[in-house]
Swiss-Prot record:
It comes from Streptococcus thermophilus (strain ATCC BAA-491 / LMD-9). This is Acetyl-coenzyme A carboxylase carboxyl transferase subunit beta. Zn(2+) binds at C38, C41, C56, C59. It comes from the Bacteria. A zinc finger (C4-type) spans 38-59. Pathway: Lipid metabolism; malonyl-CoA biosynthesis; malonyl-CoA from acetyl-CoA: step 1/1. Binds 1 zinc ion per subunit. Transmembrane segments: none annotated.
């Protein structure tokens, strides 16, 4: 050290090691997913305290969950049989990077597309079932999503089954352009055929349900349920405010606001959904 060099005023330590009783130890690693920040109360919540239903113990905020987690919560154990798994996503517009994004999302989520379709029983009531997963490109609706849901309604007509759909979506998939928008009319036509057959269609709106999904099959159910505080809408809040040049209510596009104005039949806690759906299916001549 030179004559005029300053001594450091701190001690250098290795953040990955610590010494106790003269023995060097590695610092235990804390798993990244040990805690979750609640968007409702802004508190750090121990993951185990959220429970299987993923509901904040402090403010009852309902976290988003995957399609698999939804299945585990809703259907009878071992009853789910997946349908229409072999449909491949194409890139009709040759949208740059689309196929790479799909491949990365498939690897991350373990899903082939943004919706899981099949048949299952809920508390003994048999139903055709679709669950959208916002982890897959925000459950945007492309041609495969449209095809799977359409086929589900066609299957339900043949088997004389009700249809239950858990919606969650950011809207039409922009990478597929007009092909994605066409799915709105395609699914709506299938819903109408199912209705003409005298069969029940029940939707459960989960956070978020927006865009083309809201403008089509999400709001066409004979019975429309929603989870608490679900974001439901077509255009974004700022787009609407800039268009109508008015300030919207704070709870605008929330499930509670829509129920108050007649667009949602009931808001049901996640832990009560399976029982509620089963009861509604039984009222409408459920199949066992």
């Amino acid at each position: 050290m030179g004559l005029f060099d300053r001594k450091e005023k701190y001690i250098r330590i290795n953040p990955n090691r610590y010494v106790r009783n003269g023995v060097d130890h590695p610092v235990p690693e804390v798993p990244d997913d040990l805690f979750a920040k609640c968007p409702g109360c802004k508190q750090a919540i121990y993951q185990k305290d959220l429970g299987q239903a993923k509901i904040c113990p402090n403010c009852s905020y309902t976290f988003r969950i995957s399609a698999k987690e939804r299945l585990d919560l809703t259907v009878d154990e071992g009853s789910f049989q997946e349908l229409f798994t072999g449909i491949k996503t194409e890139n009709p517009l040759n949208f740059p990077g689309y196929m790479e994004k799909l491949a990365a999302t498939k690897e991350k989520t373990g899903l082939d597309e943004a919706v899981v379709t099949g048949v299952a029983t809920i508390k003994g009531q048999k139903t055709a079932l679709a669950i959208m997963d916002s982890n897959f490109i925000m459950a945007s609706m492309g041609t495969v999503v449209g095809e799977k849901i359409t086929k589900l309604f066609e299957y339900a007509i043949l088997e004389k089954l009700p249809v239950v759909i858990f919606t969650a979506s950011g809207g039409a998939r922009m990478q597929e352009g007009i092909m994605s928008l066409m799915q709105m009319a395609k699914i709506s036509a299938a819903v109408k055929c199912h209705s003409n057959a005298g069969l029940l269609y029940l939707t459960v709106l989960t956070d978020p349900t927006t865009g083309g999904v809201t403008a089509s099959f999400a709001m066409q159910g004979d019975i429309i349920l929603a989870e608490p505080q679900t974001l439901i809408g077509f255009a974004g809040r700022r787009v609407i405010e800039n268009t109508v040049r008015e300030t919207l209510p704070d709870d605008f596009q929330k499930a509670e606001f829509l129920q108050e104005h007649g667009f949602v039949d009931a808001i049901v806690k996640r832990t009560e959904l399976a029982d509620t759906i089963a009861t509604l299916l039984s009222f409408h001549g459920g199949v066992q």
